[in-house]
Amino acid sequence: GLHSWKAMDAYIFPDMEKMYRPELMKDLTKAADILVNAINDKIKIRVIGDYDVDGVMSSYILYRGIRMLGGEVSCRIPHRVKDGYGIRDYMVDEAADDGVGLIITCDNGISALGAAKRAKELDIKYILTDHHEVPDKDGVESIPVADAVVDPKQKACTYPYNMLCGAGVVYKLMSYIFEGKNDKSYINELLPFAAAATVCDVVPLADENRIIVSNGLKILNDTAHLKNTGMRKMIELLELSEHIKSGSLGFRIGPCINAAGRLDDASLGLKMLMTEDEKEAVKLANELITLNEERKELTAQATDDAITQIEETNALERPVLVVYLKDCHESVAGIVAGRIREKYYRPAYILTDGEKGLKGSGRSIPGYHMQQALQNCQ
């Protein structure tokens, strides 16, 4: 609810001037100084993101922003199956082999203690940006030792709003740097990608997130003047020009970006955003759209198989549903678990064969803490 005139005004008139000052976020100015110095010193920079929409958009915001500042930057997006989630120690070794002097994580890293330690051992500067909860044991946070840790969910961070997505966090970082250079055009160019990630990562569309999405949509709907070739071609192929709403991001554009991370390689989506060649942009956008259609078919089949198994066994006698689907693609297990939870309104796990043993995903209902329940089984 809205409990003050100020909150009501921000909700009705979500103007960019009402965004909080970036420097209020812990370590953000420190991260900005490290990044700008690395660019000025011609140090190679490596961005390490994630394979979902937020991870791809976060990576692009950093990549594009650093390129606009004249920096030398490359990106590494983990493969869902081969690498798993988040930065790994060997990714730091890869960066060292490539002569990288600064690593920046986005939408991941807050739980990767080993990677931060490895970077320090190799004398690589390490900026951690994330938006996930900080691992906590008995009330004590376990935070990686990095040159800068930018995560609004840290207890020591007093930023007024801690529900930004990963792209929202790096957007604040880049906007702070560009403000210092008095160039708002670059800030506006990056905004639509923070907006897309905000919707697709399903963070609350309130407070600062609402401002990001509202203003990002205005830029996206001016398709003819949209600077990003890949995003413009995706919008045209999906026939969304000048009719883009938050639902368009969440249910049309987002799933196409996500499909690459689920069925192929998430770097496809990033390549589409990076390219300035119109023919390549169309080719990549079409690939993503095709992958999403395939993902829909796989999800529908796996959901039908799960329902059949539940209905034909005594599964509904148990308060928690656990379903093993041999032929389910592991990348759609979470979507299927969500649909099973919705149908039967009880916690659901979908398991399938992984490279080593079983892999799966779970979706819960209010009042049932899945992580705690799993820990109790150990």
Give a label for each model feature.
Residues 95-203, 209:
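Conserved phosphate-handling catalytic cores of large alpha/beta enzymes
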Residues 1-102, 122, 179-378:
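Hydrophobic helix-and-loop "lid/oligomerization" segment in the mid-to-C-terminal part
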